[in-house]
Amino acid sequence: MPRRREVPKRKVLPDPKYGSEVLTKFVNMVMSDGKRSVAERILYGALERIGSKHDDPIEVMETALENVKPRVEVKSRRVGGATYQVPVEVRPERRQTLAMRWLLEAARKRGEKTMAARMANEMLEAAESRGTAVKKREDTHRMAEANKAFSHYRW
């Protein structure tokens, strides 16, 4: 238990163009060295590419995130000199953060020329339940399933 008062969560302002809080969080994750305009250009460019193929790019992005969100993950826990990988459920906030992180990681490793193109293609693949980010989630779930026997070590 914390000794001091709990720090309140900061509210994220909705995105000016699409009115989405999720998109604002995504912009913040893409941003490096405080260059928000560059991060916005990347994400808006990706959403425009998605928009040329689909009706609602925000819906595609949210579907992609939903398909990448992990339900369970493993945490290391030492018990009597042995380290066990204990499966634990993921909090909703962490689910979203992990999904965004994995999508971004997968997009950065892709081969397309611009980051906007990489992001768009990774989101489109994730929305169709394929791609590197979805594979990462499947691997995480597989690890948790394999270590189900240690779930009684949960804390």
From Swiss-Prot:
Family the UniProt entry places it in: Belongs to the universal ribosomal protein uS7 family.
Protein's organism: Halorhodospira halophila (strain DSM 244 / SL1)
Keywords: Ribonucleoprotein, Ribosomal protein, RNA-binding, rRNA-binding, tRNA-binding
An MF annotation (GO) of this entry: rRNA binding
GO cellular component, one term: small ribosomal subunit
Highest taxon listed in the record's lineage: Bacteria
A Pfam family assignment: Ribosomal_S7
BP GO annotations: translation
Function, as annotated: One of the primary rRNA binding proteins, it binds directly to 16S rRNA where it nucleates assembly of the head domain of the 30S subunit. Is located at the subunit interface close to the decoding center, probably blocks exit of the E-site tRNA.
Oligomer and partners: Part of the 30S ribosomal subunit. Contacts proteins S9 and S11.
InterPro entries: Ribosomal_uS7, Ribosomal_uS7_bac/org-type, Ribosomal_uS7_CS, Ribosomal_uS7_dom, Ribosomal_uS7_dom_sf
Gene3D superfamilies in the record: Ribosomal protein S7 domain
Ribonucleoprotein in keyword set: yes
Protein name: Small ribosomal subunit protein uS7
